[in-house]
Amino acid sequence: MIAAIFLAILSAFIHAMGLLALLYWQTRQWPRIEADFRPRNNLPVLLIIFTAILSLHIAEMLLWAGFYSWQGALPHFETSFYYSASSFTTVGYGDIVLSRSWRLEGVTESLTGVLLLGWSAAYFFSVVSRLFEIRGDLWKRQAGQHSSAGFRAR
């Protein structure tokens, strides 16, 4: 169980460092997006963020799978990764189960997965919210420019 708690903390550390690096990259993209707000500018940013977050989750699942394989909890790495992905995402098909002595590690991975997936969802939501905010500001500016032509700005 101590190893599982260590893996949970390590997973959270990996996730935090990945999101901080992503945030650093992302904040450098905002001026360009704000200056020329178009879908062709937004889509690559969203896809890069999605891919980075997906990569973080895969790395965290690989960490847990490596632990299961290293400890002999599951027979093959492929099986370990499949079990890890199933537990991490809380799908839990049940076709592969850990032995009685490893059950708490599986539960800890599931709890870690729920928290990290939620953290990622919140991060992605904040990015999309910021894009909507930028779009709204742009529309307000455009409405203000056209108000002298008979349009009323809100």
Features from the language model and the residues they span:
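Outer-pore turret/helix-boundary of cation channels
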Residues: 56-83
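Membrane-water interface of transmembrane alpha-helices
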Residues: 14-31
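Short, highly charged, low-complexity non-transmembrane loops/tails of multi-pass membrane proteins
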Residues: 133-154
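Helix-boundary and loop/linker segments of multi-pass membrane transporters
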Residues: 36-43, 95-99
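Interfacial helix-start motif at the membrane-water boundary
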Residues: 40-58
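Juxtamembrane inter-helical linkers in multi-pass membrane proteins
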Residues: 29-39, 84-88, 138-144
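Pore domain of cation channels
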Residues: 6-15, 79-136
